[in-house]
């Protein structure tokens, strides 16, 4: 199997992109894939924190590019079998940390891994171009709110200049609001952004680490990426019908 490199990106910050990267990586690894997560959000990186690996980091991707260590020396093994982190650089980035050189690092890891997920900075500036230029495909993370969808639409359009047809992950979806029609549905978002939704992640209050995140929606997303099968999770399923209407009223109270 040829390694697939996927950039996880978003137009708007704060949509949960880094958490999606970590949870999707875990789900892919639990399907038996060898997965490396590369944190390309230089300066604002926290993928190591979400994974609970911040105290194990010795080298980072800049050290690899600057030949201060080999790529395998910089890898940090996560608690999930087959899941590894290539940490982001802290502080000043030299001129050698480019999309081309990040891609060379990924190419060097390709014989060992099935998937490389690259956590991209929010926005569409230099960090975006560096991360996207190193990858072959893209997942755009958004929430079902108008400001996030507007920014995601810009990112989807921009990715076409890289000859990418990204798919979408809709994060932080409240099932009660979806069932009552107060936020757009999966189909409506697909029509708006002209892209396929591969994953729908329900809202989870106060969860910021990998161990506490629900696994089911990410397992479903991983199976769609690996096998092209199944449908994304429907967070509104429990809020439809007679009893669902009661649950919606209780949610509002």
Description of each model-found segment:
Residues 37-111, 207-211:
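P-loop/Walker-type NTP enzyme "switch/lid" segment
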Residues 161-253:
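C-terminal lobe/tail of nucleotide-utilizing enzymes
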Residues 29, 132, 160:
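Gly/Ala-rich phosphate-binding loop of Rossmann-like dinucleotide-binding domains
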